């Protein structure tokens, strides 16, 4: 574990730290720690997936990162500034979160109303709101949905409106908390593309707490939680080629890697791949 951390520090030595989590512990009942002395860094413009089984602590850490929970021990820094739980301004202005079920984020009659609500809370000048909402809606391709009743939207459309609401406030860090879990396959695929675009085109730092092993392959780095502690961190290619670790931690394989493994059992050798296009390209070149 220490070796993983040192390697990550060396690879990112010239990048600013977006989050520094230092020796954080948390307990809901003040007896049993859900997070136990957790430390890790996340760098600016990095896409990090946090994974682990139910009860591992991954959803709790997301709530600590956005200030919904106050750790009983440890410190949290964002872009070098220690977060005071008496003043959340620096945290609130730099971090946005999209939850598993976006319904709780909708309060207006239309999608546009819901996006505007977040801007009103930030006391944004009403004269520029329409331009901000339009720009945010273009990023996630929902301009045609702005005047529609939020309750009539599909799950995938609601998630895109929720993302637009976050983007409108222009945070540097965006956290997705199990955001693909309630979506159909098409919705999941659309959301995964948006996550990549936010990192690659909008230069956001993206953190995804997820059970979706196929999404994890898109990340720059994976952090694995178990029983309130980090047991492994590394690139997807490092994590998912370590079959001994996957077996010992009872983690599932992404579908595309299961398929690659099955091909190898049929004497069709392929390299590590993160999507079906890469896999098909390798297979076609072998013919």
UniProtKB/Swiss-Prot annotation:
Protein name: Energy-coupling factor transporter ATP-binding protein EcfA
UniProt source species: Malacoplasma penetrans (strain HF-2) (Mycoplasma penetrans)
Record keywords, A-Z: ATP-binding, Cell membrane, Membrane, Nucleotide-binding, Translocase, Transport
Location of the ABC transporter domain: 19-252
GO cellular component entries: ATP-binding cassette (ABC) transporter complex
Highest taxon of source: Bacteria
SMART domains per the UniProt record, alphabetical: AAA
Localization (cell): Cell membrane
Coiled-coil boundaries: none
Residues that coordinate or bind ATP: 52-59
EC number: 7.-.-.-
Molecular function per GO: ATP binding; ATP hydrolysis activity; ATPase-coupled transmembrane transporter activity
Functional description taken from the UniProt entry: ATP-binding (A) component of a common energy-coupling factor (ECF) ABC-transporter complex. Unlike classic ABC transporters this ECF transporter provides the energy necessary to transport a number of different substrates.
Record's keyword annotation contains Nucleotide-binding: yes
Pfam families: ABC_tran
Coarse class of the protein's main subcellular location: membrane
Membrane association type: Peripheral membrane protein
């Amino acid at each position: 574990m220490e070796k993983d951390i040192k390697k990550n520090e060396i690879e990112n030595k010239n990048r600013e730290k977006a989050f520094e989590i230092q020796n954080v512990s948390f307990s809901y009942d003040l007896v049993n720690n859900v997070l136990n002395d957790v430390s890790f860094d996340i760098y600016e413009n990095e896409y990090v997936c946090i994974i682990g089984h139910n009860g591992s602590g991954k959803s709790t850490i997301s709530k600590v990162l956005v200030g919904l929970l106050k750790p009983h021990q440890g410190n949290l820094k964002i872009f070098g500034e220690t977060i005071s739980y008496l003043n959340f301004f620096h945290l609130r202005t730099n971090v946005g979160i999209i939850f598993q079920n976006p319904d709780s984020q909708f309060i207006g009659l239309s999608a546009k109303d819901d996006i505007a609500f977040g801007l009103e809370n930030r006391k944004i000048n009403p004269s520029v709101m329409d331009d901000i909402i339009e720009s945010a809606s273009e990023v996630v391709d929902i301009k045609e949905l702005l005047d529609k009743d939020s309750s009539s939207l599909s799950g995938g459309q609601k998630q895109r409106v929720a993302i637009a609401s976050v983007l409108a406030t222009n945070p540097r860090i965006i956290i997705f908390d199990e955001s693909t879990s309630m979506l159909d396959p098409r919705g999941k695929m659309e959301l995964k593309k948006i996550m990549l675009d936010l990192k690659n085109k909008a230069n956001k730092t993206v953190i995804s707490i997820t059970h979706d092993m196929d999404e994890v392959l898109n990340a720059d780095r994976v952090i694995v939680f178990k029983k309130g502690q980090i047991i492994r961190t590394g690139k997807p290619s490092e994590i998912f080629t370590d079959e001994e670790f996957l077996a010992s931690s009872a983690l599932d394989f992404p579908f595309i890697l299961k398929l690659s493994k099955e091909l190898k059992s049929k004497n069709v050798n392929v390299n590590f791949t993160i999507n079906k296009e890469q896999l098909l390209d390798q297979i076609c070149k072998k013919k």
